[in-house]
Every structure is written in C-alpha cells, then in structure tokens.
C-alpha cells in the first residue's frame, strides 16, 4: 500500500477535493437529528432540486454501489405482471439484463451493439409490436465506450406509449444538465462517487413519488426494497433502514456544497466538456484514435484504440503512467482493443495538460 495520491482519470471512484476528504474526519451517530435531519434530509432535498423544479418527485439514498440502486429499482418498480424493455449498448445495459434475468423479471433486451447509438425508430417498433411492455430502462452515459445515449428521444417514446421510464444516469447526473420531469423520467439512478464528486458508499434514486408509492410489497429483496427505504426516510426524517454510511454521507454533503460553489451543474458540465475536448485533441496529436465519432461522445470518459505496435502492452503503459501519478482505465469493449481515460472529478485544464505530457513520456513503444 502506498501513501502517494494519484490523479484518477476514471469514471468513478474519482479524484476528490481535499475538503471532501476532510469532511469524513467527523464521526456521526445514525440516530442523531443533527445527522438525519441536518445532513441526510438536506441531501435528499438538494438532489431532488438538482433533478427538476417540478413537484411530485422525491429522492431515496441506498447503501452500496450504483449497481445496488439499479437492482433495487428493477426489483421494486416492476410487479409480477410487468415487462421491461432494456436498451443496451454496453456493459451496464447488459448488467441490467442480467439482473432482470436473475430476479425473474420479464424483459425484452434490445442490444444495439457496443459502438452503435440506440435506434429510436427500432425502439418505437418494439413498443408498437409488444403492448405487454410496461417499463423502459436504459443507461444515459455508457462508460463502456463513453457514448451518450438519447434519453430525451426515448423519454418522448415512453411518454407517448405510457411506459414507466427508468434511467441509469450513474455517470451523468450532476455533470450534464437535465430536467427529469421534462425528460419523462420516473426513476433516475446515480451514485455518490460520480459527477457530484463524492466518495463511494451509497447510491441514490430520484423518483416520481406516485410511481414509488405504488411499489409497496413488490421488492424481490429485503435490503434492496426501494419502497421500504423511502418510507423509512420519509417517516423517520432521514433515518436509514440499516447502517448508514455516515462518513460517505458527510463527504457527499460537502461535495454538493462545492458543486454549488463551482456554479452548479451547468458550470461543471462546461469544465468536463473542455477537459474532454482538450484530451481528445491532445491524444490525436500523439497519434491515438478515438473508438467513437465525436458526435457520440459524452464529456465523461473517452475510449481510445490501443496502438498497433507489437511492443505495446497496456499493463506497461499503465505502469509508466502510474509512476508519473496518473491512473487510467483498461478497455471494456469486447470487440475492440482499447483503453479509456476519464476526465471528471477534481480534474482541471492544467491536469489534462500534465496528463498528455505524461502520456508522451510513457509511450515507450515509440522510443
């Protein structure tokens, strides 16, 4: 174990500010009103306000990673008579398909391939052909490739067909402006350690209250019962059903404060966009090519093809970058040899410039 701090160029966990880390130095009692009312309830209100100004929405915090919340939503929102259309073009859409299968949830998997944008006309045709579909679920920012999926167009379809709409906005909420009411989203799922720039430990769901209230008794799990977690927080002023990740929650409260100080989601989105554009321009100047065309990219993470040089090994490239204080991600695309670089978190223009210099130094196969 090393005490050296690296710059994490990943989609989360990510590099956090010193003050977010310092917020975890305080020990909270999970029964204390200062914590539940003063911190948890404030977070819930702030998250809902970030998602929409419209009435009728609420937020629920849930222990665990983002996948725990995805599974909680699927397992709680769909009744035994329901069926979900899962739009998948990467590992995280595929994970929803796997979850649905394990929980015995009726589903239709529309897999459009890892490097293709979902075809909205194809989704329209599926909905038209199968009236038993009651829900639609999809990922917004698919970090497998860095693709940003068309949640607005699919939301319009969900509204037109009267379907419940579930969006995994794990790596976009807080970093890309959105109004979930305008997008017709019924359940939005995200995590503490993504664009809000907190640390791992809990995820959250922002839901249409009317939909959530109908979930009573549906859950396939005790601990992942979204309705029960919501009622506990509502009825007990922020109390969690089971042990609250107190230090992570305090860090998240500080991260929300820093998001506001930066200028809100619009300002953070602008920084992320500039980071990503500078990264892509610099990498192309070094001879790297992006997996996706520019119009498909999110401002969150970018996949680059691995060099074709026979001397290149990702593990060696990674090691040389890490020696210089930078950590990147291996590829996750099954049919393409690539690696990924994220640009969210406490990462600024000077960091991208320093990273590009480090990459040039680490390109041992060109020496």
From Swiss-Prot:
One BP annotation, GO: organic phosphonate catabolic process
Residue numbers bearing the N6-(pyridoxal phosphate)lysine modification: 194
Quaternary structure and partners: Homodimer.
Reactions mediated catalytically: (2-aminoethyl)phosphonate + pyruvate = phosphonoacetaldehyde + L-alanine
Function: Involved in phosphonate degradation.
Keyword Transferase part of the UniProt annotation: yes
A GO MF label: 2-aminoethylphosphonate-pyruvate transaminase activity
Name of this chain's protein: 2-aminoethylphosphonate--pyruvate transaminase
Family label: Belongs to the class-V pyridoxal-phosphate-dependent aminotransferase family. PhnW subfamily.
EC number(s) reported in the record: 2.6.1.37
Keyword list, A-Z: Aminotransferase, Pyridoxal phosphate, Pyruvate, Transferase
Taxonomic superkingdom: Bacteria
Keyword Secreted: no
Cofactor(s) demanded: pyridoxal 5'-phosphate
Listed PANTHER family: 2-AMINOETHYLPHOSPHONATE--PYRUVATE TRANSAMINASE (PTHR42778:SF1)
